[in-house]
Regions:
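Acidic catalytic motifs of isoprenoid enzymes
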Residues: 1-143
Length: 143
């Protein structure tokens, strides 16, 4: 999946410890797929439905129920590193926000968006890296 997209993930993933790569790849696949639902033309007219379906699948996977393999892999990452389910759910909220809001009028609005978009990703990466201290998570949020 990573090689098919235009981001820096394929190169960056080589810099990660080998034991983290599959988990970072699972996070990337989860987020990239949801982002595609919000952005790609082929999902026009059904973007909310696809994001909602993805969330439903994540919730099922997190309960060891039938779900797409990609979500089962990501749910395994969440369990392995005790990542709060709220983080990926917040990220899905950000993708929904992308569908209704293109520009933000105030910094407060921008920070609220970041609370649901960039911050959860940074925090999930920190969990995978074994960093659980809330103070360090807040530092990540402020980047």
């Amino acid at each position: 999946m990573a090689a098919a997209h235009y981001e820096n993930f394929p190169v960056a993933s080589l810099l990660l410890p080998s034991e983290s790569r599959n988990h970072i790849a699972a996070l990337y696949a989860f987020a990239r797929t949801a982002d595609d639902f919000a952005d790609e033309d082929k999902y026009e007219g059904r973007r909310f439905q696809e994001i909602n379906r993805w969330e439903k699948g994540l919730l099922a996977a997190s309960k060891n129920q039938k779900a797409p393999l990609m979500l089962l892999a990501f749910a395994n990452t969440l369990k392995t590193f005790r990542i709060p389910l709220l983080l990926p759910l917040n990220l899905l909220k950000a993708y929904r926000m992308d569908l209704t809001q293109k520009r933000y009028k105030t910094w407060k609005d921008v920070f609220y968006y970041c609370k649901h978009s960039a911050n959860p990703v940074g925090r999930m990466v920190l969990y995978i890296a074994g960093i659980r201290e809330e103070k360090l998570h807040r530092y990540s949020d402020s980047i």
